[in-house]
């Protein structure tokens, strides 16, 4: 092998020496009898058996977000891992809280989702492929519910469920556009009641959201019972508790709800648990994992999906309303290539030097930084370094941040790792930010109506002139008001590539309106989803899926997971 060969993420992961998970638990302060082992390097934590340190103040949360991304992503997970490793290297007691990867994007576009280079969580292939079975359990609970609903309709429909007004779909942890719209119950009177149906991807399921927002097993059961899956013929909402199956669904999730403990390459403890997308769901790991990490560590580094307009806004306005997990510091990840794309450079030319394009695209970063400040937090910009970045481009961006009064650091945590010195400057700036006074607040009060909440988000965060509602969305607004759901927060479903609902409009557009085509009350999770533009809750695969490059070697080890 050439000394100059750049190793892939998978090769780096396979070359790493992992510690037994019991050693990672000891490092985190987790008593061994709270562990439920899944082999030598993975464990679930039974939080009921966790012996917590007396008198310890809750750890401070660092939320990692980003500017609007390129299709390959800008390295939030890599930065999260590298930053945590660097903080640990500086002597802080740190834990990571991350989402679990979804199989659809792994086989589709991303190829893996556990960080990259020398800033990864391990065992990388296990986490990317099935892990501890949490997504299987969530998928099973979701589809069990729909099987029970359709069976109830077939067996006489005592609740009077209207098959034309179902609001809940079956799910699959895969990108499969062919399943977006289907018809079920065909084949005669013994095969069920025919109706139009469809599939969502598992990470868009309300059960995934409930799973990630529940505070404990009892809260999980209560939230599952509150899920509205459809309406009766007289348009009365029907819930899981009406059907009487919340106990069965809780049973299917009783082990999955326990957080998963793994490690970084540098040996930092990491809780990887839950995984809703941020463009079509709320985009944060489980609340149980975040809260557990805060009880054990002094600093918890977590991330929220896609740009600060999506995951970070939802962390602040949805997750941080349920428990005391508000961030004390926020990191906005920026890359030279993303700035170039936002400045109008085509994908195939992103690796070419172009300071002018960086300058043209920086308005996108500026809006994201300003948006974080609207929650009362001054962010730190982490410039995730790529090999194609030139000194001139990096110097220009650092100078721009300085002129804007924004703390910034170049982080080479992919190439040098956070366990090395690749994230030391970033860690120092984040540690300083954690000591600064925080004035965190939500973007809007819950007393505001749903229409006004949406208008606030699109105007304050996206920079839109206003919002337009389709006729079906306006009808659903009236239903939301009638059923007493107006006090719920809003979860916007929007393309991740633009502040608008049009993925092709890059930069920091002005003079546009956001189009809300549908509103979906998620009464178990406790928010209203607003579908905008053409965003899909069941994605499709690209023309050349990453799966085409994947295989196993003669020893059964995966290859091609980037």
From Swiss-Prot:
Transmembrane segments: none annotated. GO terms for biological process: tetrahydrofolate interconversion. The keyword Glycosyltransferase does not apply. SUPFAM superfamilies: P-loop containing nucleoside triphosphate hydrolases (SSF52540). Its EC number is 6.3.4.3. Keywords: ATP-binding, Ligase, Nucleotide-binding, One-carbon metabolism. The keyword Endoplasmic reticulum does not apply. One of its GO terms (molecular function) is ATP binding. Belongs to the formate--tetrahydrofolate ligase family. HAMAP family: FTHFS (MF_01543). This is Formate--tetrahydrofolate ligase. It comes from Paenarthrobacter aurescens (strain TC1).
């Amino acid at each position: 092998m050439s000394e100059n060969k750049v190793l892939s993420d998978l090769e780096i992961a396979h070359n790493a020496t992992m510690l037994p998970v019991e050693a990672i638990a000891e490092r985190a302060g987790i008593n061994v009898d709270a562990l439920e082992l899944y082999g030598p390097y993975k464990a679930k934590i039974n939080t009921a058996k966790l012996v917590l340190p007396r008198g310890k103040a809750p750890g401070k949360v660092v939320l990692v977000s980003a500017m609007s991304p390129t299709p390959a992503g800008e390295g939030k997970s890599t930065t999260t891992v590298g930053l945590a490793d660097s903080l640990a290297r500086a002597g802080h007691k740190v834990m990571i809280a991350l989402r679990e990867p979804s199989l659809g994007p792994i086989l589709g576009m991303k190829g893996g989702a556990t960080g990259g280079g020398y800033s990864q969580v391990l065992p990388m292939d296990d986490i990317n492929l099935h892990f501890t079975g949490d997504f299987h359990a969530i998928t099973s609970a979701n589809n069990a519910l729909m099987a029970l609903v359709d069976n109830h309709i077939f067996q006489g429909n005592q609740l009077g469920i209207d098959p034309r007004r179902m609001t809940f779909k079956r799910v699959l942890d895969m990108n499969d556009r062919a399943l977006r719209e289907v018809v079920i119950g065909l084949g005669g009177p013994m095969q069920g009641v025919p109706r139009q149906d469809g599939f969502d991807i598992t990470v868009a399921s309300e059960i995934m959201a409930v799973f990630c927002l529940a505070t404990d097993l009892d809260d999980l059961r209560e939230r599952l019972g509150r899920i509205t899956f459809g309406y009766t013929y007289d348009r009365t909402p029907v819930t899981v508790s009406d059907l009487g199956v919340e106990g069965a669904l809780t049973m299917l999730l009783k082990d999955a709800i326990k957080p998963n403990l793994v490690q970084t390459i540098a040996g930092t403890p990491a809780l990887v648990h839950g995984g809703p997308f941020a463009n079509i769901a709320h985009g944060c790991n489980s609340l149980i994992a975040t809260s557990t990490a805060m009880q054990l560590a002094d600093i918890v580094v977590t991330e929220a999906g896609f740009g600060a307009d999506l995951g970070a806004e939802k962390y602040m306005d949805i997750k941080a309303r349920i428990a005391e997990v508000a961030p004390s510091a926020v990191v906005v990840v920026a890359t030279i290539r993303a700035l170039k794309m936002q400045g109008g450079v085509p994908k195939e030319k992103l690796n070419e030097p172009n300071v002018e394009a960086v300058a043209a695209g920086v308005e996108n970063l500026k809006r994201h930084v300003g948006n974080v400040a609207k929650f009362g937090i001054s962010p730190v910009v982490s410039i995730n370094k790529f090999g194609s970045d030139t000194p001139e481009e990096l110097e220009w961006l650092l100078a721009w941040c300085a002129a804007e009064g924004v703390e910034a650091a170049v982080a080479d945590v992919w190439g040098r790792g956070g366990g090395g010195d690749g994230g030391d400057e970033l860690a120092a700036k984040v540690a300083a930010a954690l000591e600064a006074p925080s004035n965190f607040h939500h973007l809007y009060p819950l007393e505001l109506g749903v229409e006004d909440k949406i208008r606030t988000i699109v105007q304050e965060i996206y920079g839109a002139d206003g919002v337009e509602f389709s006729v079906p969305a306006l009808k659903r607004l009236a239903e939301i008001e009638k059923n007493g759901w107006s006090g719920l927060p809003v979860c916007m479903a929007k393309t991740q590539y633009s502040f608008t609902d049009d993925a092709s409009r890059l930069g920091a557009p002005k003079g546009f309106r956001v189009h809300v085509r549908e509103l979906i009350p998620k009464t178990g999770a406790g928010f209203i989803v607003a579908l905008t533009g053409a965003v899909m809750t069941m994605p499709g695969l690209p023309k050349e899926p990453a799966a085409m490059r994947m295989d196993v070697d003669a020893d059964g080890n995966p290859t091609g997971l980037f």
